[in-house]
Amino acid sequence: IGWCDWSSDVCSSDLAQAHEEFRHAMKFYDFINERGGQAVLAAIEAPPAEWNSPQAVFEGVRDHERKVTRGINELVDLAAAERDHATSAFLQWFVTEQVEEEASAEDLVHKIGMVGQHPHGLYMLDRELGKRKVDGD
């Protein structure tokens, strides 16, 4: 039985999160094309499929959000150096979004740290995550 077969609330939330991330990518795609560029979609490295512990999963999420933030900050710096005000304005939405994403990831690392490997705590955290609301942008 797969994860989505027995945990439909969490799976639904994860799929909604995936759609949100796709919409974020499309913002970049559309912006580049609207500005006369040609956005090219390339393959990205798959995330790890195996983790040593639930703690490691959430730490991986947090580390990934930090990596995304660094990339966005580099783009902001480049736009400023190029005096590209339209791109700077466009990127501010992502700067703000990453503050929220990093805070959320850090909160999850903290919660899983409190729960540890206790099955009841993991179950309750899983239920909480399944009830998350995902922004529609």
Q: Which role fits each region the language model picked out?
A:
Residues 119-137:
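Acidic/histidine-enriched, glycine/proline-rich intrinsically disordered or flexible terminal extensions
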